[in-house]
From Swiss-Prot:
<dbReference type="GO" id="GO:0005198">
    <property type="term" value="F:structural molecule activity"/>
</dbReference>
<dbReference type="InterPro" id="IPR002210">
    <property type="entry name" value="Capsid_L1_Papillomavir"/>
</dbReference>
<keyword id="KW-1160">Virus entry into host cell</keyword>
<comment type="similarity">
    <text>Belongs to the papillomaviridae L1 protein family.</text>
</comment>
<keyword id="KW-1161">Viral attachment to host cell</keyword>
<keyword id="KW-1145">T=7 icosahedral capsid protein</keyword>
<dbReference type="InterPro" id="IPR011222">
    <property type="entry name" value="dsDNA_vir_gr_I_capsid"/>
</dbReference>
<dbReference type="Pfam" id="PF00500">
    <property type="entry name" value="Late_protein_L1"/>
</dbReference>
<keyword id="KW-0426">Late protein</keyword>
<comment type="function">
    <text>Forms an icosahedral capsid with a T=7 symmetry and a 50 nm diameter. The capsid is composed of 72 pentamers linked to each other by disulfide bonds and associated with L2 proteins. Binds to heparan sulfate proteoglycans on cell surface of basal layer keratinocytes to provide initial virion attachment. This binding mediates a conformational change in the virus capsid that facilitates efficient infection. The virion enters the host cell via endocytosis. During virus trafficking, L1 protein dissociates from the viral DNA and the genomic DNA is released to the host nucleus.</text>
</comment>
<dbReference type="GO" id="GO:0019062">
    <property type="term" value="P:virion attachment to host cell"/>
</dbReference>
<keyword id="KW-0167">Capsid protein</keyword>
<dbReference type="GO" id="GO:0075509">
    <property type="term" value="P:endocytosis involved in viral entry into host cell"/>
</dbReference>
<keyword id="KW-1162">Viral penetration into host cytoplasm</keyword>
<keyword id="KW-0945">Host-virus interaction</keyword>
<dbReference type="InterPro" id="IPR036973">
    <property type="entry name" value="Capsid_L1_sf_Papillomavir"/>
</dbReference>
<keyword id="KW-1164">Virus endocytosis by host</keyword>
Length: 507
């Protein structure tokens, strides 16, 4: 990157040449007028909204955690366009070009009705409401209460050809000089970047923080995030990515307001400065010795937020989005024949309550001891894509940039280095499995390593779901209409002349 830097004096000098420059995909990718439509099946998931339900020994998950406050990270696989038997072979020259996909449109369909789901904790760290206090109340050994609330309202999706990058605050490493003196002290924290995987929790009003490491009492947040890490997309890093693969574009809508104002229980780690630190009377005046206010109460204030109204007038889903110009250098080119769609939506956050009886006999009267309550949450998705066929020329300048960006692309195109042939004569034993011959050579077949194999995604296979008949699908018809590729024909008006009946002549 070319930057102007100061010299030893006060004059800024231009950067030294030459400087490597990353080209936009529009500079070397040629687009064709061939478009395909792809649509997934109806994608459904069912589970418990707060935690995994495990077997008696805890080794097997019987009911997975499925929450409306989770990210859904889809990894959509597309067919290799270079293996297509195109009807018009003049579209590209396989000796000088390679075919790639470009994303031109997407529609993320959401099923199920709009609804508000609540979260909470049966032992929530809440002393009392601090907005309208009628008397001065101190803390006791255990002030936890059963509390629930509706989370912050979030609608968001990020489109790219590599996974979405997230950020969260986590516990940092302590300096060596202070490593042995951290009991009861607040640990240092640092901002970390991680990939957003399917099932990760997003922020519901308590921040993007690793609650598993930084919430010792397991009561500061709700059950669904108390043992999780809440992540937030790192839009700043993805916007400044030199290649722009992680985020072609995104849509985001968040809203919340502080509904209740509480104070935490426990001792204050960073006490209000007083005379003990030479700050007497700077922040408060002490009360008389016979008053309750003599012992100052906890000052760890916090709100529980509310996502407020959920309405169909402010929905990001079930509507098409067209990609004309991406925010980065990659203008929608799907390297590796895959697209990553990361979704966060809790506007369909209804949790089903299912009640069953524990008695085999018919129940005549209501008895809560004989009724068992269950919680379930369901989600429904369907993803539609408009793909454009594009050509990449196999010239040195283009291949050098693609190789620097991702050398695996050239391997998929079978453009790697071809070694010289070895000796054509090999030893072939007939009875290789018998005890009379040597052990067979343990040569494992080499497979291409998946760079995203260690991450968890909702895999969607669309390798056999592409169609050229765009007018047969809802998103395809919308694309043809907005692109001006198809106009609605008016019916031809025809007029039929009717002859008048001849009058009979009177005789």
């Amino acid at each position: 990157m070319s930057l102007w830097l100061p010299a030893s004096g006060k004059v800024y000098l231009p950067p030294a040449t030459p400087v490597a420059r990353v080209q936009s995909t529009d500079e070397y990718v040629e687009r064709t007028n061939i478009f395909y439509h792809a649509i997934s099946d109806r994608l459904l998931t069912v589970g418990h909204p707060y935690y995994d339900v495990r077997s008696g020994d805890g080794q097997r998950i019987e009911v997975p955690k499925v929450s409306g406050n989770q990210y859904r990270a889809f990894r959509i696989s597309l067919p290799d366009p270079n293996r297509f038997a195109l009807a018009d072979m003049s579209v590209y020259n396989p000796d000088k070009e390679r075919l790639v996909w470009a994303c031109r449109g997407i529609e993320i369909g959401r099923g199920q009705p709009l609804g508000v789901g609540t979260s909470g904790h049966p032992l929530f760290n809440k002393v009392r409401d601090t907005e309208n206090s009628s008397n001065y109340q101190g803390t006791t050994m255990d002030d936890r209460q059963n509390t629930s609330f509706d989370p912050k309202q979030v609608q968001m999706f990020i489109i790219g050809c590599i996974p979405c990058l997230g950020e969260h605050w986590d516990k940092a490493k302590v300096c060596e000089k202070d490593a042995n003196n951290q009991l009861g002290l607040c640990p240092p924290i640092e901002l970390r970047n991680t990939v957003i995987e399917d099932g990760d929790m997003f922020d519901i009003g308590f921040g993007n923080i690793n609650n598993k490491e930084l919430s010792f009492n397991k009561s500061d947040v709700s059950l669904d995030i108390v043992d999780e890490t809440c992540k937030y997309p790192d839009f700043l890093t993805m916007a400044n990515d030199v290649y722009g693969d992680a985020c072609f574009f995104f849509a985001r809508r968040e809203q919340c307001y502080a509904r209740h104002y509480y104070v935490r229980g426990g001792s204050v780690g960073d006490a209000v400065p007083d005379g003990a630190v030479n700050q007497d009377h700077n922040f408060f005046l002490p009360a008389k010795s016979d008053q309750q206010q003599r012992t100052i109460a906890n000052s760890t204030y916090y709100p529980t937020v509310s996502g407020s109204l959920v309405t169909s007038d402010a929905q990001l889903f079930n509507r098409p989005f067209w990609l004309q110009r991406a925010q980065g250098h990659n203008n929608g080119i799907l390297w590796g024949n895959q697209i990553f769609v990361t979704v966060a939506d809790n506007t369909r956050n209804t949790n089903f309550t299912i009640s069953v009886s524990t008695e085999a006999a018919q129940t005549e009267e209501y008895n809560a001891n004989n009724i068992r309550e269950y919680l379930r949450h369901v989600e429904e998705y369907q993803i539609s894509l408009i793909l454009q066929l594009c050509k990449v020329p196999l010239v040195a300048e283009v291949l050098s940039q693609i190789n620097a960006m991702n050398s695996g692309i050239l391997e998929d195109w079978q453009l790697g280095f071809v070694p010289t042939p070895e000796n054509a004569v090999h030893d072939i034993y007939r009875y290789i499995d018998s005890k009379a011959t040597k052990c067979p050579d343990a040569v494992e077949p080499t497979e291409k390593e998946d760079p995203f194999a260690k991450y968890s995604f909702w895999k969607v296979d669309l390798t056999e779901r592409l169609s050229l008949d765009l007018d047969q699908y809802p998103l395809g018809r919308k694309f043809l209409f907005q692109a001006g590729l198809q106009t609605r024909k008016r019916p031809i008006k025809t007029s039929v002349k009717t002859s008048k009946n001849a009058k009979r002549r009177r005789t």
